Amino acid sequence: MSNKMWGGRFGEGPDAIMEEINVSIDVDRHLYAQDIAASKVHAEMLAAQGIIAANDAKKIGKGLDTILSEIRDDSFDFKRALEDIHMNVESRLGELIGPSAGRLHTARSRNDQVATDFRLYVRDIIDETDNALATFQHTLATRALEFAGTVMPGFTHLQTAQPVTFGHHLLAYVEMAARDRGRFADARRRLNESPLGAAALAGTSFPIDRHATAKGLGFDRPMANSLDAVSDRDFVLETLSAAAIASTHLSRFAEEMVIWTSPLVGLVRLSDKFTTGSSIMPQKRNPDAAELVRAKTGRVVGALTGLLVVMKGLPLAYQKDMQEDKQGAMEAFSALSLAIRAMTGMVADLVPDEARMKAAAGDGYATATDLADWLVRTLKMPFRDAHHVTGRIVAAASKQGVALHELPLSAMQAVEPRITRDALAVLSVEASVKSRTSYGGTAPKNVRAQAKAWLRRLEKKRTPD
């Protein structure tokens, strides 16, 4: 038995294996709201242009509203034999309103239909992701203000480098999330053109108004080339690229959470809400949420890589390969959404061990650079010379097994006789962070100002800029 939607050319129905590989309703059913919205706008345009009767357009609109309600209340019967969301909606529309349903597909192909639906879907995802990232930023900035003066070790190569404040560290991720939001916003601007009306690939001979349908669906304009409109998925690739970068930022933070919460490090404690136990070891508090955020980056990056491979060899215009554009992308967007929410929750509830942070901040001679800077400022020593002198002083402290601020002044003067007791004042971790007043530096007053500025910006406009 042939498929009644496209079966006029065929004498027999498809093989069961063909049906199985061809069907996409399990995935593209998630486009139902976008598909129905685009169909309603298309029908209204057809009537406005005199292509179909106004009464038919009215019936179509009411029927589509009924279908939308049925899907939302789980009473709609999705049929795999009808392949995809477009055919399922059209078939049900025919059951509801009769022959008028057949007029809906005038001047339209599933090629421009699915391209339109998926653009609308990805646009919605971008808006949802932007809101989630803004909430994440707000949570980070709130905690940054709270811990603007909390001293912790700053790291390079995962070795203690210089003291910073915990608030400063949190604000670094506010900045990263801002750039992530900017990338999503850029992708949205390029995405926001309508493929609807491009038909199969060459446009249509009907006097349609593509500007009207574009406006009705919130697009800035119709796409200018019908071949391009139906055959490219760069809007998905660009959004997945932004998602992959955002996910990588989250993964880096999640990795820090895993390290910081280890009993060997002990800088931070996550709440019970975001940790789990062990089935055999009753003492365990595992940072599973952070570990899963870290792992989900693979799903997002994998979706980007997968779609790049799907698209890389496709000639114009539409190819059925493009049916594989949705599942990986949808799973990636879902993974990113969950990861953002999980990280937001962890940040909101985490408790830093401020005493341990302060103690760790002084480990590894972390204020050595402050001594070198003192030599430059006070003794007018070239920085490279100051670096060498400080290195010798650190070696002396290491040999004696003491911290830099515990090294006797006489031992320092044995290396550089002009050093005075004033140099000792710069060697505390508090003095170190307080001195970093350059723009973007870790000084607590800087951190407070930046955190407050971000909170004002986020509460006022929720802008990524």
Curated annotation (Swiss-Prot):
MF (Gene Ontology): argininosuccinate lyase activity
A single cellular component GO annotation: cytosol
Cellular location(s): Cytoplasm
Pfam families: ASL_C2, Lyase_1
Pathway the protein acts in: Amino-acid biosynthesis; L-arginine biosynthesis; L-arginine from L-ornithine and carbamoyl phosphate: step 3/3
Domain of life where this protein originates: Bacteria
EC number: 4.3.2.1
Top EC class for this record: lyase
Catalysed reactions listed for this entry: 2-(N(omega)-L-arginino)succinate = fumarate + L-arginine
BP GO terms, sorted: arginine biosynthetic process via ornithine; L-arginine biosynthetic process
InterPro entries reported for this sequence: Arg_succ_lyase_C (IPR029419), Argininosuccinate_lyase (IPR009049), Fumarase/histidase_N (IPR024083), Fumarate_lyase_CS (IPR020557), Fumarate_lyase_fam (IPR000362), Fumarate_lyase_N (IPR022761), L-Aspartase-like (IPR008948)
Entries under PROSITE patterns matching the protein: FUMARATE_LYASES
Similarity section: Belongs to the lyase 1 family. Argininosuccinate lyase subfamily.
Protein name according to UniProt: Argininosuccinate lyase
Species assigned in the record: Nitrobacter winogradskyi (strain ATCC 25391 / DSM 10237 / CIP 104748 / NCIMB 11846 / Nb-255)
